[in-house]
Every structure is written in structure tokens, then in C-alpha cells.
Amino acid sequence: MLIRNLLCLLERVAAEPMSGEIICYSPHANAGYCSWSYTQLLVEAQRASHALESTHGKALVPGSRVLLHFTSHWDNIVWFWAVLLAGCIPVMSTALPTNGFLRKAHLEHLARTLINPLCLTRAVSVSEFADQDAVNPIVIESLDLAKPLGPSNNPSGSRKHTRGLEDTAAVLLTSGSTGRCKAVCLSHGQVLAAARGKLDALPPADESFLNWISLDHVAALVEVHIQAMLARKTQIHVPAPYLVSQPTKLLDLVHAHRVSRTFAPNFFLARLREALKNCPTTTANENLNGATSIRADQPSRWDLSCLRCINSGGEPNKTRTCQEVSEALAQYGAPGNIIVPGFGMTETCAGAIFNQHCPRYDLDHQLEFASVGRCMPGISIRISAGLNSNQPVPIGQPGFFQVAGPVVFKEYFNNKHATTEAFTSDGWFKTGDLALIDERGHLSLTGRSKETMIVNGVNYDPQSVEDAVNEASIPGLVPSFSCCFSCLPAGSETEEICLVYLPTYQKDDVAARVETTASISRVVMMAVGVLPQVIPLDEAHLQKSSLGKLSRARVKAAYLRGEYNAQRNLNHDLIRAFRRETRTAPENEFERDLLAAVIDSLGPLDEDEFGVDTPILDLGITSIELIKLKKDLEASLRLHRDIPLITLLTHPTVRDLGTALRKLQGTQVYDPVIKLQAEGTKTPLWLVHPGVGEVLVFLNLAKFIKDRPVYAFRARGLGGDDERPFTNISEAVKTYYTALKHEQPNGPYAIAGYSYGSMLAFEISKLLEANNDRVSFIGSFNLPPHIKTRMRQLDFKECLLHLSYFLDLMTEARARELADELRDCSRDGALETVMQNASPTRLAELALSSSGLLRWANVAFALQSMAVDYEPTSSVSGLDCFYCIPLAVVAASKQQWLEDHLAKWNDFTRSPVRFHSVGGAHYTMLSPEHVFDFQKTLRRALENRGI
């Protein structure tokens, strides 16, 4: 028989014996649980519906909305069905804001949107509706719920049969881009199609469903309650606090109730992992690729052989977390693919796309965040070229994620504008996410289209900034309680970046406040290139949803309303006072002049806060600003000789720099090693310069690597006219090898080169291995093993043009045009032509003269000339190749570059090469807009090599 609506489903299941039961745990600690059969649920719902109709029948017009505001699962379940039996539409209320102003505004918005709905609640919650008149709650204790049902007062008769599959069954609330919720209409047909699709995609065993999130979330309502009913299975509902405080209780419940399916977002999985590490019955060990394995010492504690699926969504799932939790649970009998990341929204009736091959698929494809998988029946997906575009992009290309199908909603209640905006002209729902579909049909989310922040013309995803802050493990910040957004201050022409967070320190611990602010600022500066507005807030201002998510839209709206002004001003005043009190003053006139020159060059800086011991690089300055500082200091201090950039890099404070500058008049000895980053205890990372010889290109990258020291090799010849370039590869390799062993006598070693530097890194690694040293990581940044053909193309003029494009003095297209013009020119003529065609603004930014460019080009040409007959020989233990869009002269596409050129590294390694696709092109892969994603890929590759 066709199920016409949800009420038909309830009646049919209630009439079947042994169709399962509903178990609800009390919200009170140690109060146990109660259970009801589906037959008892129907009776309770009929009684509640009759009591409501008896008292408020005139207001219960068919199709009218009834807001359900309850804290217990059982209340929500009973009254959901009671309202349906009354011919009305249940609206599941979310938790009300604790802030009085926001709560009133929210209720007024609901009253307008839902057109004066009835509201049901318990007496214990009625105080939440104080100080407002928009929504007047009905206390269910005032209804006559004890009256027995008879044929004359049974509400399950005619009304349920008038509702068809297209009619609205329920309304759920979801946050919109302005912070105001939208009301999502879920039809009977949509909900039933979604439940069937989930059962088809992930068939349950003969066990039960476990839910621990509130019924206002679509996953609890549809993915557990309705789906379990359709499957004739038992469902268990547990209050979230019962589990969040003690994550292993989830396993206790699975074991006790023989649960086959449950739900856990990434934040809970991370907590479960940590709880298992510290559990008396387990031991945590680090495996070879750096991941933590958790071994069960007493496997009998939990029998998880019943567990088939832990759905996970609502936030990105880290592959490593999925791997570690899966391995831990497998110790107790769970299958290896127990974690099922997925995608779902209120508009799609919760999860509709599932990754059933996690973490194996994601590890094989080297995904930092797990794929969300493939579609269940009832939904189709596409990636479009634009937000409103109907044109799909090719497989593997990111774009705007859209969905369609029977499980997708049709409208927002009483909001035609939002409904129109939500769909494309051909009827596909715009999810607001950015994503791509890989060659196997797996979907991966890459960001949110509406939350993009634009900084200096570059788009950034605020989620990636929050991830960076959380990954930094800052002591003064509660993990996952940070929120990043951008806004345009009044009177400003550019957006500012804001980050609010929940602190761990006491309010009067100013030193911790200052250190936390500085740490957050450094991370954000590294991610987006500008200093953020950092504001600590209390937990009342950072309320999470039932899935543990902070609403960025709501937080941003509160900031724009000025609700955080007091906290911002207090934080600013305390930090400023602390820095003034602890500032180190100059000791002599030279330090005073040098400090003033630095402040003038890098300003605006507060002279009362920036002292001689303040690290200059902590300001997050770019390589361009570093070069500007060099020229400004040379001019203001009237030094007799240029300041080498190496001096600025290796002497990061005014005091250190002053000492170095006093010695500048003496004889300089070439040292190839530049220490870019000194923090961390992991294996140091050594970076070899590209073909231009300089290491400035690594500055952006080094900022992100705080868990290990970062060194770079700088070519000889850049320090002045007295410093001669290398004459052959062997000389360079031996020089770098000797310097490396002096700085790091023992392995394991990690070394990588950018472009030309990859060849030198390969040769240095061979020399290390020949001397019985272990090289755990060798990286090639976009260079194949065979390079002599390209090197022979690069005469002095080509090197000069190559350098000019690398320094952004001109475009690649203009450099190619000049190549023909300069063919018969002398060196001096070529240099003059390049200077004439170079961007004057860029030359000024670099403070680059004709003689300076000539010296640089001579070094670049010397390096290229060394490799015109280079042939790779022998092999290394392994290699990681990071590849991007190639130069136009070497390959027509990224895929051709990989298959025809880079893949040949496999001929020179004793294990398969690991290839990593990264963003950008050959000259931009480490630029500010790409370096954040690049460093994540690099750090993951280092971890996977066991270092």
C-alpha cells in the first residue's frame, strides 16, 4: 500500500508487532531512560492532539504553523505527531539566544515569518518568552492530557488523509546569510524519499539507531526518527550533554543497545579520539606516518561488532581524525570504514551524499579533509561555473555546488525572495558551497561561496583561517571556539579581518591575553597577509548549534551591531598598557635612529609598543616590504655599503640588526645558510633556492611552519661584487652539504628544492645517503629530473627575462615578446631594454637598480650554465613531487606536465614517487594566494613520511 503521508507511516508501523521502540534518556544525570512502542507513541500523540484541539481548536486552522519549543526528545516527538494529527504543521524551534536583545529579535522574526504561529512549551521554559509579545507560548501542562480517548474524540481520522506527498509535513529553521533564520518547508514526499534513500545507501543491520542531537536538527528528525520508523527499528535518543562531557559514553550506549547507526560530527570524533587515548583500557602509540594508533588493552569493555555506520557531517572531517578513530574502534569489532562523512542540509533532509570508503579513499587520494562521497537515490549533483550558472564545469574542476531531486526542498515558508534566490533558472538548488567532483564521482567540498573574504584583491576562505588557528594549538584559545569573518568598517575603503575566540585564561591574566592575541595575529597574518582585529569573548557570545557549529553569520551580525565593542576596547587597552610597560627601550643613539627608521618604513607602528627586542618578522612583512626596509635603512642611516637581505633575515630584531650593521664595514664571509624559522622540535626542513639564487620566495612558506626549524640555501654571488658565483654543480652541492652537516650533524634529514633547486636537493640527498645518512623527505617543487634541454634554452638574455618575470617586473607574455627583440642584443643592450620595459612601480618597490638587476642576472645565468649538460644518475630512497600549472614553454597542460615530464622521477627513486597537485602556476605556487594551501599539503607530506 502506498504511504500517502507521514501519519500513514506512523499508523502502519504502530499496527505491526515487534516493529521497534523509542528509548529516551532523561536530561537529568543518572535518571535512566523510558521506552515506548510505536503503538504507544501513536496513542500519546492522539491524546495530545485531542487535548490541544479541545482547548485551542479555533486557532488550529488546517495548515497553520505550531512552534514546538521543548528540551526533551520525547516531548518533541509526541508533539510533532500531535500537531500533524491536528492537521497543522509542526515547526521545530531551535534554542533561543541567551542575549535578551537577540532573543526578542529572533522571536519577532519568527512571528512575522510564520505568520503568528501557536507555540507549545513546558512551564520550565516559559520564562524564555519573557519581555516580548510576538510569540505567546501555550504551556502543555495547562492542557487536559489525562482524558482517555474514545471513538468520538480520536483525532486520527479524516485530517491525516487530506495531506498528500506534496504538502508540507514540517518546517525546520536554518540560519541565513544575515543571521536571521529561514523556514525550510519539508514535504511528506520529500521526507519519505529521503528516508528511503538513506536506507538504500546505507542499509541497517538488525539493530538500532542512536541520536544525541536535538529534534530541531533535521538529522535527528529525519535521519534517525523517521528513518528508524520506516526501517521498523528501535531508536535511542540521548541528551547531548550526556555524551559531550564524556565521549566514551557513546560506546557504552552502542554496546548496551546494540546500535548499528549513529551520528558524530568531526569535533566529537576528535574528542572521542582524545578520550580513547586517555582511557584506562587503551594505549596510544604513534605509527610510522605520524598518526596516532590506539590499542585496546581490554577489548572486552565494548563489543562494537553491531556498529555499522557513524554518519558525520555539519563541518569538514579531517582524514587523519577519521583514520585514527576508525583504527581505534576496529579494536572493539567495528568495521574499518565505520566513519561515513557526508553532505546534507536542512534543505536536503540531512545527509544525502555519503563517503562509504573512508578513510581508505581519502588516504589514497591524499585528502586532508575527507571526501563526502557519492549520492544516495533521490538526489543529483553538479558543479557549475558560476553561482547562478546552469553550465557544469569539467570533472575535477572546482566550482559552485548545486543539487536537485526528490529529496531537495521546494520553498522557504513565506519568503519568495529567498526561494527565488536559492534556485537556478533550471531549478537546481544553490547550496552555497564550493566543491569539485573527482574522476571517481566523489564529491569534495572546498569552501563556502558566500563567506569568501577579499584581502588585497585575493579571495580567502574564513574556514581555512579558523583551521589554521585551531591547528596552531594556541594555549590561550579553546579549540573550535574561534570565528573569522571580514567586514567593511564605516569610512574605510578596505575590509578588515576579525577573529573572535573563547579564551582559556582568566580575565585578569594580561600576559596570557597578550601572548594569545599575538599568536592568533601571527597565524592570521600568515594566512591572509593582514593583521586582524582579535577579540576574546565569553561563552555566552559564542553559542554553538546542536552540531557544535558557530554561526559565522550570527557572530558577524552581532559584531556589526556593536555588541562586542566593550570587549574589543577592553582588550585593546589592556594589551597596549602591557606593551608599554614591558617595552625594551634603545640603549644608544644608533639603536634609537635604527628603531625610528624601522617604524617609519614599516608603519604605522606605535612607538610606545614596538621596542628594540620586538621581532620584525612577527609583523608579518612580505618580501617586498623587506626589500623596502632594506633601502629605507640604507638611505636613512647613510651606510657606506648596501645591507644584504641576508642580514635582515638573520637578525630579526632592531637590537640584533644594529649589532650586525656595525660589523657591516668589515669583510663579509659567504654563508649559504639562511635560518628562516627557528621554532619547533621536529626534523628541520631545508629548502634550496630556485634558479634565481635568492631565498625570498620561501618567506611566505616559512611563516606557516612553526613545528620545525626551516633553513634555506642561498646561492653564492648575491652578496656583492667580491662574491663570485658557483662554477659547477659539484661545487654548489659540496658547499651546501658541508653547511647542512655543520648546522644539523645528524639525520633524519628533510630537504626540498623549488624548481632548479629540486635538482640540487636531489644531488645533496644522494650525497647524504652515500654517507649512510637517512633522508626521510626529498621534495621537488615543480621540477622534472631531466632539465638540460630547458637549461640550454636559457642564455644570459633568457635568464634576464626569466628573472624579470620571476620578480614581476613584467608579464610572462611581455617577456616572451622581448625574447625575439633581444636575440641580437649585447648584454648591456638587453639590460637597458629590460629596464625600459620593467614596471617603474615594481622597480621602486624592489629598490632595484640596473646594476643590482645585472648582478642578480649574472648569478642566475651562472646557475643555469652549470646544468646545461646535467643528467640525473643513481637514485634516492623516495621523493615527493609538488606540481602545478607549468610554464607555457615546457608543457601545454598540468596533466601533460605530470605524465610526460614529472613522472620520470620514478626512474630515480627506490620507491614510488608521491605526487601532490597544488594551486597556482610555476611562479605563483608559493605566492600569498596559494601558500596557505601549499603549506598544508607540504606539512601533510612531511607527516606521512614519518617526520
From Swiss-Prot:
Q: Where is the Carrier domain?
A: 585-665
Has UniProt tagged this entry with the keyword Transferase? yes
The modified positions for O-(pantetheine 4'-phosphoryl)serine read 623
Q: Name one GO molecular function term.
A: very long-chain fatty acid-CoA ligase activity
Q: Region (Thioesterase (TE) domain) spans which residues? A: 684-934
Annotated PROSITE patterns: CARRIER
Q: In which pathway does it act?
A: Secondary metabolite biosynthesis
BP GO annotations: fatty acid biosynthetic process
**Keywords, alphabetical:** Phosphopantetheine, Phosphoprotein, Transferase
Q: So what EC number does this one have?
A: 2.3.1.-
The segments labelled Adenylation (A) domain in the record are 25-413
Q: Which SMART domains match?
A: PKS_PP (SM00823)
Q: What catalytic activity is recorded?
A: 2 3-(4-hydroxyphenyl)pyruvate + 2 ATP = atromentin + 2 AMP + 2 diphosphate + H(+)
In Pfam terms, one family for this protein is: PP-binding
Q: Which domain of life is it from?
A: Eukaryota
Statement: the UniProt record of this protein carries the keyword Phosphoprotein: yes
Output the PANTHER family linked to this UniProt entry.
LONG-CHAIN-FATTY-ACID--COA LIGASE (PTHR24096), MALONATE--COA LIGASE ACSF3, MITOCHONDRIAL (PTHR24096:SF267)
Q: Which family does it belong to?
A: Belongs to the NRP synthetase family.
- Give the domain note: UcdA has an A-T-TE domain architecture. The adenylation (A) domain recognizes and activates the aryl acid substrates, and loads them onto the thiolation (T) domain. The thioesterase (TE) domain shares the missing condensation (C) domain function, and is responsible for condensation and final product release.
Its biological purpose is as follows: Nonribosomal peptide synthetase that mediates the biosynthesis of usterphenyllins and uscandidusins, p-terphenyl derivatives. Within the pathway, ucdA condenses two 4-hydroxyphenylpyruvate (HPPA) units to produce atromentin. UcdA first activates HPPA through its A domain to AMP-HPPA. The HPPA unit is then loaded to the T domain and eventually transferred to the TE domain. Another HPPA unit is then loaded onto the T domain. The TE domain then catalyzes the condensation of the two HPPA units and the release of atromentin via cyclization.
This protein is called Nonribosomal peptide synthetase ucdA
Its source organism is Aspergillus ustus
